[in-house]
């Protein structure tokens, strides 16, 4: 009996110590998101991914979705099936301190069917749907060896607020006094309550497995409407704030501005900045040790037109999303290497090949942007607000100063995977890692 008790106590100590190692409270955790929506070759993806993992504490694989009929987890990696799940979790054999989580939603589980898009709310509404989801989560974690899951739940978005300056800004404020606020979700109070129920039930099911659960707060999701902060904090291990894309060319195609400033910018919505979001969660009694700051590895671009002027100083009038890059293939979105190559382009080149002019922020408050004014034919103008290694390091320093748990990079596929920018591979990720190293 005495030997059994000694064994039990030792076993319990090992479990507790292991968990302390995982959740060490310091601003040094790096969460690396990996979005595979453009991946077609599993082996190539793994080869490109592996060098980044020495800098990551957590790898968050995205994204899985939800079947709108069964409410079970489904793969969104069309053509890859579930093979890549096993390949991703097998990376832990080389990186034994790495924890690999499966992210659900992340604004990737989208269709043109409105009923299908509402499935994230419908799932919350009854116990049987929630149980189907939870059982499928348990099965996926056990089958493929994930260490847990990330809940990047797809709640309805706040409607865009168009940015204006000068007299138009004050006119808009006056008009807003007489406008009715749009109804985002008539049952938001019920969904808020049931989301807590889902997290409670998930936590109970994951605890015996020793699984981790994080929550990603996606851009433009109202925490006031959908997230009951205090009970949520009790059920998740980390809360990851996607503190970027405050303004995008799809939410407002007519005005280009900073998309992920640390602090409030003049002529900008005062809530559209990192410090505002962090303070909101802290004001609602969230422990700093649970908060993680999201940093993008890309830029958002707008088309400059003749009315945009030639200075590039934001806010500027724009003509819609900028041209798609050769990697992202998405209008209004450029990866870090697509931007850095244009900044260092030969100045003699013209047209779409012409270089971007970079404008840094010496205050470290708002971020960096680059632009190319229209040519004599009013063509090829572009303006992009983006993240680079220096600004990412600034945000890591901010996270440390606020005593947050760490930084999450969105995402590895947008970083300099092949070293095109001249600073080696994964230069944004390494800048975050090096910023934290200074404080050890």
UniProtKB/Swiss-Prot annotation:
Sorted UniProt keywords: Developmental protein, Disulfide bond, Glycoprotein, Secreted, Signal
Annotated Gene Ontology cellular component terms: extracellular region
Disulfide bonds: 32-56, 340-421
A molecular function GO annotation: chitinase activity
Coiled coil: none
Localization per Swiss-Prot or TrEMBL: Secreted
UniProt-listed Pfam families: Glyco_hydro_18
Miscellaneous information on this protein: Lacks the typical Glu active site in position 154 that is replaced by a Gln residue, preventing the hydrolase activity. Its precise function remains unclear.
Function: Cooperates with insulin-like peptides to stimulate the proliferation, polarization and motility of imaginal disk cells. May act by stabilizing the binding of insulin-like peptides to its receptor through a simultaneous interaction with both molecules to form a multiprotein signaling complex.
Family from the record: Belongs to the glycosyl hydrolase 18 family. IDGF subfamily.
Protein name stated in the entry: Chitinase-like protein Idgf5
Phylogenetic lineage: Eukaryota, Metazoa, Ecdysozoa, Arthropoda, Hexapoda
Gene field: Idgf5
């Amino acid at each position: 009996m005495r030997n059994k008790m000694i064994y039990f106590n030792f076993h319990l100590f090992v479990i507790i110590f292991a968990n302390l190692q995982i959740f060490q409270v310091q601003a040094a955790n790096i969460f690396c998101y990996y979005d595979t929506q453009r991946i077609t070759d599993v082996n190539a993806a793994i080869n490109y991914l592996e060098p980044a993992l020495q800098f990551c504490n957590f790898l968050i694989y995205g994204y899985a979705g939800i079947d709108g009929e069964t409410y079970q987890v489904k793969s969104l990696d069309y053509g890859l099936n579930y093979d890549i799940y096993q390949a991703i979790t097998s990376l832990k054999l080389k990186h034994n301190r790495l924890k690999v989580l499966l992210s659900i939603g992340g604004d990737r589980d989208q269709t043109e069917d409105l009923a299908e898009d509402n499935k994230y709310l419908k799932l919350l509404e009854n116990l049987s749907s929630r149980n189907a989801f939870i059982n499928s989560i348990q099965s996926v974690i056990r089958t493929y060896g994930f260490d847990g899951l990330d809940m990047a739940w797809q709640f309805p978005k706040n409607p865009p607020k168009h940015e204006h300056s000068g007299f138009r800004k004050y006119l808009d404020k006056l008009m807003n006094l007489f406008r009715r606020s749009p109804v985002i979700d008539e049952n938001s109070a019920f969904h808020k309550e049931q989301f807590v129920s889902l997290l409670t039930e998930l936590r109970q099911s994951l605890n015996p497995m020793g699984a981790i659960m994080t929550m990603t707060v996606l851009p433009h999701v109202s925490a006031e409407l959908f997230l009951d902060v205090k009970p949520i904090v009790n059920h998740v291990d980390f809360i990851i704030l996607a503190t970027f894309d405050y303004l995008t060319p799809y939410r407002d195609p007519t005005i280009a501005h900073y998309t992920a400033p640390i602090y409030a910018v003049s002529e900008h919505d005062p809530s559209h900045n990192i410090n505002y979001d962090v303070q909101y969660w802290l004001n609602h009694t969230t422990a700093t040790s649970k908060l993680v700051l999201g940093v993008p590895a890309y830029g958002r671009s707008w088309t400059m037109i003749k009315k945009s002027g030639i200075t590039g100083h934001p806010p500027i009038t724009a003509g819609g999303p900028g041209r798609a890059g050769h990697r992202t293939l998405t209008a209004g979105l450029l990866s870090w290497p697509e931007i850095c190559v244009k900044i260092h382009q030969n100045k003699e080149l013209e047209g779409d090949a012409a270089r971007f002019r970079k404008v840094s922020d010496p205050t470290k408050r708002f971020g960096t942007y680059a632009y190319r004014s229209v040519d004599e034919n009013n063509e090829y103008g572009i303006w992009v607000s983006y993240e680079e290694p220096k600004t990412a390091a600034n945000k890591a320093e901010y996270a440390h100063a606020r005593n947050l748990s760490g930084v999450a990079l969105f995402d590895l596929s947008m970083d300099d995977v092949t070293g095109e920018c001249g600073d080696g591979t994964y230069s944004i990720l390494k800048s975050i890692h090096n910023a934290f190293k200074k404080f050890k």
